Amino acid sequence: MPTDLQAWNALRQHHDVVRETPMQQWFAEAGAAQRVDAFSLEASGLYLDYSKNRITGETLALLMKLAEEAGVPARRDAMFAGEHINATEDRAALHVALRALPDAPFKVDGASVMPAIHDVLRRMREFAGRVRSGVWTGSTGQGITDIVNIGIGGSDLGPRMVCRALAHLADPRGPRVHFVSNVDGTELAETLQRLDPARTLAIVCSKTFTTLETMANACSMRDWFLRHGVAENQLARHFVAVSTNRDAVVDFGIDPNNMFEFWDWIGGRFSLWSSVGLSIALAVGFDAFEDLLLGARAMDDHFRTAPLAQNMPVVMAMLGIWYRNFHDMPTSCMAPYSTSLELFPAFLQQLEMESNGKSVQLDGRPVDADTAPVVWGTAGTNGQHAYFQMIHQGSQIVPVDFVAPLVPPRELPGHHVKLLANCFAQAEALMRGRSAEELQAAGVDAARIPHMVFEGNRPSNMLLMENLTPHVLGALIALYEHRTFVQGIVWNINSFDQWGVELGKILARPIEAELSGNATEAHDASTAALIARARRSLARS
């Protein structure tokens, strides 16, 4: 039990002391500059200022002691060693191998995984080059202008986020990459109506090649090709697969030579580094994809070797533990001050909440501490005009991670100065607040003062990068992967399974049959009434 650890109980007592001192007091003291130096880190092209947190040097020391007692170093080493740390599925969780050098000593069950990984990477490079250069053609001999990635969850969120983040690197001449994930037919229909079937390529991305949403969309897209004149024997020019299930790929009609494999020791939310990232290589080129891997590898090396107190993923993870478990803060906000990173919060939602949204420990007993916070956010400055009111003055305190590139894009560089000014100002305002005395001195009407007071003392991290490059983006993603893993270790849960998504899938099958025909199943009264209402509407449609 995490709460049985000595450091956990020491942190409880320490919290009772620290909560009496607001951050404003620490920043008003003579050693404020030293505080910033002490509570900042640089790694893999990222700079972290975590001085605007409710911590002292003693807090940090106790948090690092908790990480030690919880077994973070040992579990980290077990992951890199390829041990079956995904205990409930009896698998390794070796996504770090996907971005490692060919001679890296990564093994699963005693066998090196590196030759297979780098063979797939070689094939991805060749394929991306052929498509992007126009050598790969559709059924009419024309080059590919549009690519549709069909997947869901980890087969969609990661590649979609990266393609959006690196869109400034895409060749304006194409190919353009589109993403379809939802089984709601509107998404696929609206995507396809803009495309030329003769010049479109579909990537069907599913580990098992049985995922309901993905296969429904893939079948509908195959029908779309056939309706628009692509012959059955030419479909192979318009489909490739990313999967572990060769037989299902062949049964669907995709040439097995156009299948890019990955492995069951890669979790979906950790898979963008594998052939699941084929859409990235097609969108921005394989060299950029390779740079993404290099950045992640740099963060892997930092995570594996840096002392805990200088280890960026560990420090960020333990700050999250501090707020979730000792300050009872149930949510956290990701605020990237970069439109390019606007999908990063959605990516983190899956990464953190699917990984650590668990209530059972590794030994099957209930967790005796709160686990994953609700993760939310949008790109700045949009968030300032939506939910920042609550973050500044609401009754719940929300820790915020700000992320910002320092160097402006070539277009409208003056806008970037305004963007950074707002980013830094929000973090300062959260920490500093505004007192009734300040407002009174400024001549504010007495009746308004209570409504304009900012308590301050609200925590945030600031993550900065020079430019949003593939290398730095890779490091940023890997940082949050490892942060998530470390928190799972402390909570003594398995961050690499997702059994919570299974029951809904099982129950959906008979309900689909009921909605489509006359079958009936036993349901609670509410669900039965919903099905009956839907059947009446469907019958009229």
UniProtKB/Swiss-Prot annotation:
It is found in: Cytoplasm. The gene is pgi. PANTHER family: GLUCOSE-6-PHOSPHATE ISOMERASE. GO terms for cellular component: cytosol. Catalyzes the reversible isomerization of glucose-6-phosphate to fructose-6-phosphate. It comes from the Bacteria. It holds the Pfam family PGI. Belongs to the GPI family. The active site is at E354, H385, K505. GO terms for biological process: gluconeogenesis; glucose 6-phosphate metabolic process; glycolytic process. It catalyses: alpha-D-glucose 6-phosphate = beta-D-fructose 6-phosphate. It is an enzyme of class 5 (isomerase). Keywords: Cytoplasm, Gluconeogenesis, Glycolysis, Isomerase. InterPro entries: G6P_Isomerase, G6P_Isomerase_C, Phosphoglucose_isomerase_CS, SIS_dom_sf, SIS_PGI_1, SIS_PGI_2. NCBIfam families: PRK00179.1. The keyword Transit peptide does not apply. Its EC number is 5.3.1.9. This is Glucose-6-phosphate isomerase. Pathway: Carbohydrate biosynthesis; gluconeogenesis; Carbohydrate degradation; glycolysis; D-glyceraldehyde 3-phosphate and glycerone phosphate from D-glucose: step 2/4. The keyword Metal-binding does not apply. One of its GO terms (molecular function) is monosaccharide binding.
